[in-house]
Amino acid sequence: MITDASTLKSLNDYISRRIQEIPLEIKETFLETKKVWKCENELDFLYGYYVGKIEEATLHYLLKSTRASAGGYVDTFEIRGIIEEQRDALQNAIKTGLK
């Protein structure tokens, strides 16, 4: 469990910065999502994709910033919870990228 307030703030800031990059990334990368992955709902697909991508990057950032070993226990559900706290911003960023 992440108990250090400065680490938690740093993770929130990192996730916020990462979310701000998403619209440009979508415009440059995901040209025909429905054709490539044959998904029904593009917004839902990209939401799941970015939650996973941000979760992985945040875990890497956390391990790097705290100099923790990869063998140490880090609760990925806690990281996902931090991401979900910003779900509205994430959904808005994806919608902006899809316009």
Name every feature range the model reports, one short phrase each.
Residues 22-26, 30, 34, 58-69, ...:
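Long, hydrophobic, amphipathic alpha-helical segments used as structural scaffolds
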Residues 17, 56, 60, 89-92:
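A generic structural signal for well-ordered alpha-helical segments enriched in polar/charged residues
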Residues 69-99:
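Amphipathic alpha-helical binding modules
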Residues 41-81:
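Amphipathic protein-protein interaction modules
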Residues 1-34:
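Short terminal alpha-helical segments
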Residues 36-39:
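Amphipathic alpha-helical segments that form the core helices of the histone-fold
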